[in-house]
Amino acid sequence: MRIFSGIQPTGRKHLGNYIGAITQYVAGQDRGEAIYCVVDLHAITVAYEPGALRESVYDTAATLLAAGLDPGRCIFFRQSDVPEHTELCWLLSSVTAFGDLNRMHQFKEKSGAQRDLVSAGLFTYPVLMAADVLAYSAHDVPVGEDQRQHVELMRDVAERFNARFGETLVVPEARIPQVGARIMDLQAPERKMSTTGGSAQGTVYVLDEPAAIVKKFRSAVTDSGSEIARGPDKAGIGNLIDILASVRGVGPEQVEREFRASGYGAFKQAVADAVVDYLAPVRERHNAIRADEAGLERTLADGADKARAIASDTLLDVRQAMGVGPVRPRR
């Protein structure tokens, strides 16, 4: 089984990114042939600063490696180093319906009332995402719940292509974790934790110092009750339960049983301590990896060479199926 996923190099990685995506990347190395990339081409669909983007690519790559990605057990690269992604995106756009793209939730959220002013790249973002995955004939796509619609679109694109041009592309499946898929903002638990749309005190970053993490959890919004349990009117406590369950690798029911006699203050401290212990080794490894930028660049370049060997074969198959370019023997 082949696994593919990517992560944007925008902003610092927060606890939601880590639990919802990065831990799945690491686990994927044991489930099959894992291919991961830092998707810098997606990052340029909104306003950005070039120098900051390059730094963010390195920061993101270092975080992923610190979390446990092993270039000896997976293919890990920078998206823009593999031009097959962009050519395949253009070819797939010919079988992607305008209406499908117009219904994408993330496009509506990011474009807001200024839809006529946003880039065409933001609108066609899901097609590039489809190309990212389909280029590698991936079966399994680990994503957060908010990306489910994008995986459904890439499935539709692959099925439409195969129906029109013959069986060429593998139709992927989304893999969404049962616990922690959506870690919410500590100050506004009705919305997910976010680097751009979240609150400063409500977002816990992977590289936060221990004191900052503890402070954020101590001030986390809860409710006027006292029971450590999930419920429709207990979004804040429910979020903390899910966070603790995720970092411990247990079910939320186990957390509820363990802390049923605890008060909110003690429970918040327990969650904070668990998160500090969970992230401390990652922060230390990140700092060491990030200090060797030349070594980090070599790792990404080596991964890109391996990725191109696969993506170029897929692109050739797609071109041949569509009648684009000279006739060549198909694999």
Regions found by a protein language model. Give the residues of each.
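An acidic site on a long C-lobe helix of protein kinase domains
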Residues: 56, 84, 149-150, 236
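Internal, conserved structured core segments that host functional sites
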Residues: 112-161, 165, 185
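Conserved nucleotide- and phosphate/pyrophosphate-binding catalytic cores
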Residues: 149, 155-331
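A generic secondary-structure signal for well-formed alpha-helical elements
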Residues: 61, 68, 96-99, 138, ...
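Short, histidine-centered active-site or binding-site loop motifs used for metal coordination
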Residues: 7-9, 40-42, 139-140, 197, ...
